[in-house]
Amino acid sequence: VKPHVVFATPGRLNDHLDKENFSTAAIATLVVDEFDKCLEFGFLDEMQAAVTRLPALKRLMLTSATDMESIPQFIRRCAVADRAGVRTVNFLGEAEAREERLEVKTVPAPQKDKLETLARLLSALRGEPAMVFVGYRESVERIRKYLVSEKFAAEAYHGGMEQDKRERALYKFRSGCCNVLVSTDLAARGLDIPEVRHIVHYHLPANEEAFIHRSGRTGRWDETGNVYIIVGPEEHVPEFIGEAAEWNVDGERINPVSPAWVTLYIGRGKKDKLNKVDILGFLCKKGGLTAKDVGRIDVADRFAYVAIAARKLNLLMKNIAGEKVKGMKTIIQPIKQ
């Protein structure tokens, strides 16, 4: 294999190197994203092993959203550092500029159980994408179940879920098929989710780092964003959050806004030589849709997800009943909440 770019965890990268799945002769750059988190998770030995096995390495870049107290000795002793030295490029100034684009508000909850306050807050956001951060997996499931019972389009995301269910939840949120993602801090790092307008801290962040990473899901690049901290009757806003205006949501509760898109499941994928163009063509020619009625399309090995304009779903399902996709019989059905 001659890849241009290899994405892997430290352990998986070493596995590739052990099996000689690709040549290391031309690998000049190694980027370790979330370097501080890799150390926290105990990947020090794996990272050290990978660095020492790349003889042509010219650039070693370590990225972290928070300032690092020290750089491990193996980095300072590696051949790249010996030749070029270690240099820190600090983008904290840009982070401060982003903070100016974030509006932080506290939302008082009259009861210890904040569910009703959360529902009122999300209703006031009128269907704009929102991520709700909580401290425990069990809380994610409980809150998501409550929100669904209150007619919100909400999905759960945490480390206890199977990978395919996590990926489906992310797809639905990214594509606009759901507008609320309830998650542990697992979603605070490493996910590219554009246009998240609102971050809700249902449970107070454990520390400043958690607050930064959670809140960093909004206000990205040149966008603006809103951060809400729900504060219970016995809670106090941590000092590291700084000044925040108070927003009371005790007024009349607004009915939740339903997403404009729904998720369609197609039981064929890349292994069946099905691609995005095939899917779009099928939906338009057989389903009677226009390109504007079709949103994000994700094609996996054995299946595909497609965002369909909710107002056109019934027409689509009627038109494609019994139809084949690229000559293949398959299951085509909307994914329920």
State the predicted function of each range:
Residues 1-29, 37, 44-52, 166-175, ...:
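Conserved helix/coil segment N-terminal to the catalytic DExD/H
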Residues 10, 33-35, 136, 195, ...:
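Walker B catalytic acidic pair
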Residues 15, 21-95, 235, 240-243:
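Post-DEXD/H (motif II) to motif III coupling segment of the RecA-like Helicase ATP-binding lobe
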Residues 140-146, 152-184:
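Conserved helicase ATPase core of P-loop NTP-dependent helicases/translocases
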Residues 180, 189-204, 226-230:
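A short beta-strand element within the Helicase C-terminal
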